[in-house]
A protein has these predicted regions:
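Conserved P-loop NTPase "ATPase switch" module shared by AAA+ and STAND
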Residues: 32-50
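Interdomain motor-coupling "hinge/lid" segment immediately C-terminal to the ATP-binding subdomain
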Residues: 70-72, 77-175, 179, 212
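Catalytic P-loop NTPase motifs of RecA-like helicase/translocase cores
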Residues: 8-10, 44-48, 74-75
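Structural recognition of the conserved hydrophobic beta-strand(s) that form the central parallel beta-sheet
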Residues: 40, 64-70, 91
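Conserved catalytic/switch belt of AAA+ P-loop NTPases
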Residues: 45, 51-67, 81
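A cross-kingdom feature that marks ATP-driven nucleic-acid transaction machinery
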Residues: 197-204, 209-367
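Short glycine-rich substrate-engagement loop in P-loop NTPases that contacts/grips substrate
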Residues: 2-35
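Short helix-coil junctions and helix-kink-helix linkers
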Residues: 183-192
Length: 367
């Protein structure tokens, strides 16, 4: 409990309990006047009937309440529904790369390699040595995410749920949907699982903030395409731990890092689709779709972004900017590469920047 202008008041462990009446009596004894108080509650799920207790403070004009928790009860969008219109949800992401570099003892090049391998969960970042980091990630996955997801959602086929996680981990940034995943189970795992069950598991992963989905958006038609979607991990360290650090594929890992950074900055992020019709050498018209990796929106601001791990030659550059040249509007278009290049605009007004500048300077895409 924190009173403006005074020191933090520690609630002693022996006075903490799950009895809501005792808890509320203790708080009342500490709120001594009409000053502004802040109630900071960690692991709120340990308190019985905590929803009712928290709602009881709604009419207290001199009290703001902040709650956190790591249990299945809180790793859920149901909490936002429970307090809809009566509170604000703050989504706490792992450390951004800029935050990571504040504690990393090395240069940004080695830093990004480690960040893409072990992620930005503070508990893991502060561990020393590869083995300790890997062990911490494995423990988080098994003891927090898997346990809480299966417990809260009453998952019986835990093996299928873990198989689905492995499939998603091996194909980050790939377009997929429950029907495609069902076929993968049938051909690769030799097992039968319904698309409805797969959708339920995907929703469980998203509700626990383990993954996020990016929906496809028809840029010309200005309409969303329901399926398929792309899935990105909220922390790459968790993704890599899931597959025992066997597949460290930098192209899609960089794409995942860019996606997470954009979400941390507050953008909504979609996958852009541009339907086109072209004639082949025989004069036959063929229809195809070009893709823009990210369509980023925040209010009236929009950016189109391509993630290109490397631009070794002009052919590759033309390939990356081709979708941009089919977009009729004037919103800014950006290519992000891992190549060490100075920020520059080409003859089409397309900005190219390197991944380090993008991650370390939140204003670089505005310049």
């Amino acid at each position: 409990l924190y009173l403006i202008g005074e020191s933090l008041i520690q609630i002693q462990k022996e006075k903490r309990g799950i009895d809501p009446e005792k808890f509320m009596a203790y708080i009342r004894s500490k709120v001594a006047d009409d000053g502004m108080y802040y109630l900071l509650l960690d692991e709120i799920q340990m308190l019985d009937c905590f929803e009712a207790v928290l709602n009881g403070y709604l009419r207290k004009d001199n009290m703001d309440v902040f709650v956190t928790g790591s249990n299945a009860k809180l790793l859920s969008k149901d909490i936002a529904t429970e307090f809809a219109g009566r509170g604000d949800e703050i989504h706490m992401y792992p450390l951004s790369f800029a935050e990571f570099m504040n504690v990393y003892n090395g240069d940004k090049y080695m830093g990004l390699s480690e960040y893409m391998l072990y992620g930005g969960i503070p508990l893991v970042v502060l561990r020393e040595g590869a083995n300790d980091k890997a062990a911490a990630l494995q423990n988080l996955f098994n003891e927090i995410y898997i346990r809480d997801i299966t417990k809260r959602n009453h998952v019986k086929n835990i093996g299928a749920l873990e198989d689905l996680l492995n499939i998603l981990s091996s194909a980050i940034g790939s377009l997929t949907n429950p029907e495609k995943l069902k076929n993968t189970f049938k051909t690769v795992k030799k097992s039968r699982i319904t698309s409805a069950t797969i959708k339920k598991y995907l929703d469980c992963f998203e509700d626990s903030f383990l993954i996020e989905s990016a929906q496809r958006y028809d840029i010309k038609g200005k309409a969303y395409i329901e399926t398929p979607k792309k899935y990105y991990f909220s922390d790459l360290g968790l993704r890599n731990a899931r597959i025992n650090f066997r597949q460290f594929e930098q192209t899609h890992s960089m794409e995942n890092v860019i996606y997470n950074e954009l979400r941390m900055r507050g953008y909504s992020v979609d996958v852009g689709v541009i339907p086109i019709a072209e004639k082949d050498k025989a004069g036959k018209v063929t229809r195809k779709q070009l893709e823009v990796d990210f369509v980023c929106n925040m209010g009236s601001v929009r950016y189109y972004i391509q993630s290109a791990y490397s631009l070794p030659d002009e052919t590759k550059r033309i390939q990356e900017i081709r979708p941009f040249r089919r977009i009729d509007d004037s919103f800014k278009k950006i290519v992000i590469t891992k190549d060490i290049v100075q920020p520059h605009y080409d003859e089409y007004g397309i900005l190219t920047i390197n991944i380090y500048d993008f991650l370390l300077d939140p204003h670089c895409i505005e310049k």
